[in-house]
């Protein structure tokens, strides 16, 4: 019987026809149930009949023996190939099982991941009741906070509006009071000038002169500053001209070098021409013949050398001329800058002289003003002492000031006798208690305004004191006078008039403030 391949084996004929390099094909068909089915599938079956009558010849036996050996060898090789293919199939099956296992693992992981994601989504969508209540309570708290913040903002806005209204009212009151103060001061100045007459006109003239001198000093300062700016500009121009001169010198040096190089090139060209002409003369003398082409080449080279030398010389000369022209321009600019510097110096010196003259005239005007004020004050005291009557008299000291019941000053009248002079206390015109109180209230309110104005504004005396060096002595004199006044007030306390001395101190302070206000207005 013929041997049939079992199920799960490989067909060797197909492998041999397709080649050994190809992969084996696995038979996955169902196994045969019977031998007849297998025989019908592979070409049928037949009955075996032994041939006993016919004996084979010796030649036929010899021919069949090698065929059997070859078939055995082929069968052995086929068995080997079968074993190899079976091993390969086993490896492939193992790989398939491994891939199936990995695929199953991946599917399990994917399913677990999908289940986790679904659970998380469900948990996120469906929150517990406690979390929802907490969120609601927090939202309510936030709303309450926002409402309280809005209420506080509205309250602050109302307060700001009230404060603005109060500030506007206080500004209006201050403006009214300042207008009243200015009107009162104007009336006081008018009354003073009406009383003084000619002396007031002189005072106004002196003040106008002082103002004019201060303006002149400011103008001189401005001119000095302008002159300084001009000097700075001139110095900058001189520096720029110096830089230009340096560049011109560098260009001159370069032009000289170019000129020397051109001269050297010209000398080389002349030497070449002489050499060529010498060689030509020698050739003529020796009767050496040169072809026309060589002669034309030599002539062209000589002409080219001459033209190059001429061009170089012309370029060098033009550069030298340009450098000379630029040098002349720079020198002219330097001279102009020097002249401008000299003129600016002269202007500065003139401005300084004007400033010195203005300072000297200003000092003289201030001294004249002080003298006039001191003389005018003495005249006022003398006139008031003659017109008024005496009220109190000091027994211990004749030079001390006395006060009346209302807190007014008592001045002294100097009576010149034949042998000795005596001082008589006289009384200034009295004021009512309401006038005194209103005056004190006005001064207390005006002092707050004047403190701020004194910080921003400067009086004429302070402006003039910056430039004058003689104001230091004046300040020392004023300090001495203030110290004398303090000693006098201390002496008054020894009389036992405690209330009167306090009122006197307050009134002296008020007078100082009035003087400052008058200076600021002037």
Swiss-Prot record:
Coiled coil: 77-264, 299-376
Database matches in InterPro entries: Web
PANTHER family found in the cross-reference section: HEAVY CHAIN, PUTATIVE, EXPRESSED-RELATED-RELATED, OS07G0677900 PROTEIN
Record protein name field: WEB family protein At2g38370
Annotated stretches, region: Disordered: 1-32, 374-397, 458-493
Start-end of Basic and acidic residues biased regions: 473-486
Protein keywords: Coiled coil
Assigned protein family: Belongs to the WEB family.
